[in-house]
Structure formats: structure tokens, C-alpha cells
């Protein structure tokens, strides 16, 4: 399928909108009440620091809603305002934040049901309005909705669209896209649908397996068993790993994406030599600015003397998980929560999700005496949620 031609055709359709409806002022008050925070503004103005009795809060200098998320949420609110009576769907969570998605449900936005990992579009009919979330949607989903006569409101983050353009260029030049991402993440599913030949690698460990195979150090059967669910149909590692381009899920850890890119550049240089390197490896630049800013701010924050860290964001949020990884890499006692409700100020307890584990309830969360708490949040977390966590910490520090 010529995905580029399909996108161009879709973008010219009268039933497609990716620019909003000019109703920003009409939804501004609702957005402010639901997501913004006066306290957070005050803390920003005070050098990202708050002192309250024995408690000191240090905020990361970049956190919370990124521009792409703000845009997607605002467009969703505008869509309901523009289509007050129409049946309104969304193909997935608008962003990885439970409170934001709950607000959409309260606005009678229906989420496409999922049965055994497969989306069921049978309830969507001609004339329905369907929102594509910030992560985007697969080209097959877009095609289905277009053919069904739906009105499509596309809130896909432009940084994600940039990655799609990158893998389409790879496809045009018969280059295999190595996608650094989580194979079942909505964004990676969408990106791979625009690619031609592709292989998804989760981390440096998997990237090294691919690099070793390119240099003749791997077993084909073992390789295919490892990556059978992470590659394009008909993928042949002996044929399809000779010309590579790297792309990424925009919320992955920036440093690891760059390291993976350097690994494959060295690998192709070793195999083909400097004279032929440009024929076998394509450099990339698909790292999201907002993701990079939040990770850089987190690295700066964990250099400060912190007693503990609270990371706020959806448990299925990739960018939030990577912020948690940064704290843990510095040996900081860190807690990942998805909503302020996880913190019980009366009992000094917190229900949190340790990395790669199930939820855990921890007592004696805030230690006695003077305590400095670092706080950051993922790109899908509104300031209001961060404010509520800080208010609970202030209350807890007084007890």
C-alpha cells in the first residue's frame, strides 16, 4: 500500500480534520479548571522549589503536559463542542493518563472496545465522529474509518507524524527500519504500519542481538524465534538487514535511542567499510524535543540531594517509566504513581508500581525529620495532578 498517497488523499477529504475547529476560547475555561494549577505556577516562579515546614519539594524544570498532549486534549474538547449531538468515538486512550480519559468518558466519548487484543470497530457507522489519539493510529484503522464514511479528527502529535515520514522514506529506498520501541505500544504499532520492512528492538540488549547477527554471529532460527512478533510479514534477516535506517517510538529513552543508532552505524561500518557505509546505514533524527527536555530535566533533578522521588504518570506511559528509570539508576528511593489517590496522607502510605512489578502498598512512606522530595511527571500528566500530590505531601509533613 502506498501509505504516503493514502495520507495525502485523506488530508484533502472534507471528513478529515487535524487543525481543530476554532473553538479554543470556548473550551479554555474547562481545560483550565480540569488540568491547570496555580500552585505549580507559583513553584515555577520560585525556582521550582517549595519549602513547607520540614518538607522541601524540588520540581523538575520540565515536566507534565507537552505541547503535543495539550493540543490533542484541546482538540478532543473542541470536537465535542463542535459535534454536540453526534456519536463520538476515540480509537484508543487520548493520552496515557487515567483522569484525562475519564473526563472524556464523562463527555460521552466512547472508546473503541478491545476483545482479546483486537479492536472491534463493528459499532462505528457512517457519520460517526472518530478521534485519533496523540499516539496516532495505524494506517489500516484510518483506511477503515475513511471507507466507512466517518468524520476523522486527527490529534496525532506532529513528532509522531515525523517518524512516520522517516520510515516511509526508508520504504521508498528499500531500507529496513529498525524501530526502537515497545512492540505493542500504540505509537509503535502505528509507525510500523507506515513502514515497509521493519524490525522493532526494545533496548540495547535486543539491538546487540541484531548487530551480532549482521556480523555473522547468530543463529537464524533463534533470531526469528526472538523477533517473530516484532518484524514485518515475510521478514528475512539474511536479506533484510543489509540496509538499515533507525527510527524510534518518540517516548523512549533518548540516550538509549542514540546508543542504538551508534551501534548499528558501527556494525554496518565494520561489515561494509567506510566507502559503502552511506549505502547501508541512514542516520536519523526522530527524538521528540519534549521527551528529551523532560529526561534532561530529570537528570538534573537527580543530581540534587533528594531523600525520595515521586514520579506521576500513567502506568502504561512509556515516557513516565523512563523518568522512573533515571531516578532508580541513581539509587534514589522512587515511587511511580498514576494518580494522586495513590498517596494516603492520613496513613503515611503510598500505593505505587515498582519497575516491571505489580502494584505495591508501602507504609511509612515519608520519613521523619527534614525531608526533600523530588517530583516530576510524564508528558500526559496535568499540572492539577501534580498539585494534588504536593498538597498531600504538605499535609503529611504536618502530621
UniProtKB/Swiss-Prot annotation:
Name the Gene Ontology biological process terms.
Answer: dimethylallyl diphosphate biosynthetic process; isopentenyl diphosphate biosynthetic process, methylerythritol 4-phosphate pathway; terpenoid biosynthetic process
**Cofactor comment:** Binds 1 [4Fe-4S] cluster per subunit.
Q: Which chemical reaction does it catalyze? A: isopentenyl diphosphate + 2 oxidized [2Fe-2S]-[ferredoxin] + H2O = (2E)-4-hydroxy-3-methylbut-2-enyl diphosphate + 2 reduced [2Fe-2S]-[ferredoxin] + 2 H(+); dimethylallyl diphosphate + 2 oxidized [2Fe-2S]-[ferredoxin] + H2O = (2E)-4-hydroxy-3-methylbut-2-enyl diphosphate + 2 reduced [2Fe-2S]-[ferredoxin] + 2 H(+)
Binding-site residues for [4Fe-4S] cluster, renumbered to this chain:
66, 157, 288
Q: Where does (2E)-4-hydroxy-3-methylbut-2-enyl diphosphate bind?
A: 96, 185, 250, 317-319, 380
Query: Into which EC class is this enzyme placed?
Result: oxidoreductase
Where are the catalytic residues?
187
Name the pathway.
Isoprenoid biosynthesis; dimethylallyl diphosphate biosynthesis; dimethylallyl diphosphate from (2E)-4-hydroxy-3-methylbutenyl diphosphate: step 1/1; Isoprenoid biosynthesis; isopentenyl diphosphate biosynthesis via DXP pathway; isopentenyl diphosphate from 1-deoxy-D-xylulose 5-phosphate: step 6/6
- Residues recorded as binding isopentenyl diphosphate, renumbered to this chain, are 96, 185, 317-319, 380
Q: Which domain of life is it from?
A: Bacteria
Q: Which UniProt keywords apply?
A: 4Fe-4S, Iron, Iron-sulfur, Isoprene biosynthesis, Metal-binding, Oxidoreductase
One GO MF term attached to the UniProt entry: 4 iron, 4 sulfur cluster binding
EC number annotated for this UniProt entry: 1.17.7.4
Q: Which cofactors must be present for this protein to function?
A: [4Fe-4S] cluster
Q: Which residues cross the membrane?
A: none
Residues annotated to bind dimethylallyl diphosphate: 96, 185, 317-319, 380
User: Which InterPro entries does this UniProt record tie to the protein?
Assistant: LytB/IspH
NCBIfam families for the chain: ispH_lytB, PRK13371.1
Matching entries from PANTHER family are given as: 4-HYDROXY-3-METHYLBUT-2-ENYL DIPHOSPHATE REDUCTASE, CHLOROPLASTIC
Q: Which family does it belong to?
A: Belongs to the IspH family.
What's this chain's function? Catalyzes the conversion of 1-hydroxy-2-methyl-2-(E)-butenyl 4-diphosphate (HMBPP) into a mixture of isopentenyl diphosphate (IPP) and dimethylallyl diphosphate (DMAPP). Acts in the terminal step of the DOXP/MEP pathway for isoprenoid precursor biosynthesis.
Record's protein name: 4-hydroxy-3-methylbut-2-enyl diphosphate reductase
Q: Please report the organism this UniProt entry assigns to the protein.
A: Parasynechococcus marenigrum (strain WH8102)
Gene encoding the protein: ispH
